[in-house]
Amino acid sequence: GLPQVPAAAHHQLAKDWLLRNGTSYHEDRELGTKRARAAILMELALPGSAYIYQGEELGLPEVADIPWDELEDPTAFNRVRDQIEKGRDGCRVPPPWKAGTPTFGFSPATKHEGAGVDASQAGDPCEKPHLPQPQWFADYAVDREDTDSGSMLNLYRKALGLRHEWMTADTTLTWLDCDRSSGKPDGAEGHTGGTIAFRRANGWASVTNFGAEPAELPAGDILLVSGPLTDDGRLPQDTTAWIALG
């Protein structure tokens, strides 16, 4: 199996928000979203349990610029060799439900009588969420993604529905003939590209293309793709397809 990734080194905090020369890191959200869509389909096709972290189902980026005086993660208040880290609060910001409300639907705009609120307080503004929500959260709100058939939220819904339908207790995984390395640095950030392609015991197959060249898909019925295929029906880079093999 794959080696364990040390959590302390790779999962606890955001990396590379400033380059070594102090300039701002270029965040390509369009490319990141494309890769995230491909990654979740590959993950959900694998045997075993799957975990979805808050906001992944919306394609919600981490909030990396929370003001220091509004952070809650103890990491932000600990100095190690004169270095300060913001911690993981950027992943804990209350998610957006409704685009047109003050707290994006996370909490009501005004207080209601009951549960510690007396009649004299009813109608007063509610407290702010425990972490600040940026205005761009409106673009990822559930009520907006709900009506967009191509949104990340609806991709998750389709994928989880198909996973429930196609998941088999047989955890056998067989590599397909199209599973191969490209043999050249045409993958993300100059890594070797290629295709990861496998099938489950019941004929459910997943193909993910990491290389620059579009990949041929095996014969069968396409169940779901993370993004558009090429005009001739091949799988572009950073895209996953689920197929019911013929």
Stretches with model-predicted labels:
Residues G1-G220, S226-G246:
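Active-site and adjacent substrate-binding regions of carbohydrate-active enzymes
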